[in-house]
Amino acid sequence: VSFPLALAVASADEGDLASPIYGVNLPDDYRRWELIAPAEESAPLDEIRAVVGNAVAVAAYRTGTLAFPDGTVLAKLAWKRVPSPEFAPASVPGTATAVQVMVKDAQRYPESDGRGFGRFVDGKPVDRAQHETCFACHEPNVRDHDYVFTRFAP
């Protein structure tokens, strides 16, 4: 297991912080990763999102590499979208809602075509039922883009 990938995969001591099904943890340094792209989610979620990637992910995006290599880790940070108090037409991040992580490791996750997922609220993984929706959404919608929705923002 490569070092960047090891950061996102649970160890035995961190099992309670690992996502059900996949065993993915929040990577320690994800807030320092490079921005891949911002996004908005309309109602009912009404969120502002930022997708960041580790060095493996960023290199793949910059070179246009598909399939993403093993060791790719993406994190999607989400906040409630609220009007700016200084400029009403603008939206700004409000309360943080979740961080979602996707890890590419073909050997560890053969049942989900090499993808492991984690969804975290307040630093803790959500329940198994919510994790069952991850690959079920990615597989039919973005199979032809290596199961990744996010495109690199210029």
Give the location of each predicted region.
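Short, structured beta-strand/loop micro-motifs enriched in basic residues and often containing a Trp
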Residues: 46-59
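Sequence context surrounding c-type heme c attachment/ligation sites in exported
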Residues: 16-49, 65-154
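Boundary at the C-terminal end of the N-terminal hydrophobic targeting segment
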Residues: 8-14
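Bacterial N-terminal signal peptides
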Residues: 1-8
